[in-house]
Amino acid sequence: MADVKKQSFQDMLDYVHLYRLKNKLHRETADNDRKIRDNQKRVLLLDNLNQYINDSMTVEDIRAIIANMRDDYENRVDDYMIRNAELSKQRREIRQKMAAHKTAASEKNEK
């Protein structure tokens, strides 16, 4: 009996170890995907910048292009922040509804 419990406990530890390892690998894969996406965006940005720049441009012209691009990206960041806030609000509302359902279900079971 003790051997069965010991083996069962060892099986559980192995399962937990594998589960944590799987999650770690998932996080590393997601991190690598973000790095790939970020670097692809950088390449695209440089390609776009290269299309705008020609040999007759002055340094001031190039700086103006970069400033415009920066403003565009900052506006996008602001838009994403607003979108995240809206999503956060929706998640909070859903959590409250789920808690209300859970409370109602437990009260129903008590009766």
Curated annotation (Swiss-Prot):
Per the record's keyword annotation, is Coiled coil included, yes or no? Answer: yes
Keywords recorded for this protein, A-Z: Coiled coil, Cytoplasm
Q: Which residues does the annotated region (Disordered) include?
A: 92-111
Xref: Pfam families: DUF496
Can you say where in the cell this protein is located?
A: Cytoplasm
Superkingdom is Bacteria
What this protein is reported to do is described as: Pole-localizer protein involved in the regulation of several cellular processes.
The name under which this protein is listed is Pole-localizer protein TmaR
Q: Which gene encodes it?
A: tmaR
